Regions:
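Short glycine-rich, Thr/Ser-proximal phosphate-binding strand/loop in the N-terminal lobe
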Residues: 18-51
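Short beta-strand-loop/turn "lid" adjacent to the catalytic site in phosphate-handling enzymes
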Residues: 45, 72-83
Length: 83
């Protein structure tokens, strides 16, 4: 996951055919601590190909927003996968 800032935050976004998932986590001395998770239905992909960019962007924004709300952190960069 992308290193988001000095707090060792990591952010990953998975854009899939059925859903978009955003996870916000941090590295600690004990391991990885998940701070927030956002899941949103995806309707802009078909067979791993983006067919409706506006719907895909909206789903990503919503998943990120949910993860930010849960974690209390703001996402500035992330690793993104499309499947």
């Amino acid at each position: 996951m992308a290193n988001n800032n000095k707090n060792n935050l990591r952010v990953g976004i998975d854009i899939g055919t059925s859903k978009v998932v955003c996870i916000i986590a941090e590295n600690t001395s004990e391991g990885i601590n998940v701070l927030g998770l956002g899941i949103q239905n995806s309707i802009g992909l078909r067979d791993g190909v983006i067919v409706d960019i506006e719907s895909t962007v909206a789903a990503v924004k919503e998943a990120v927003s949910k993860a930010e709300l849960m974690s209390g952190k703001q996402v500035t960069k992330a690793f993104v996968g499309i499947s």
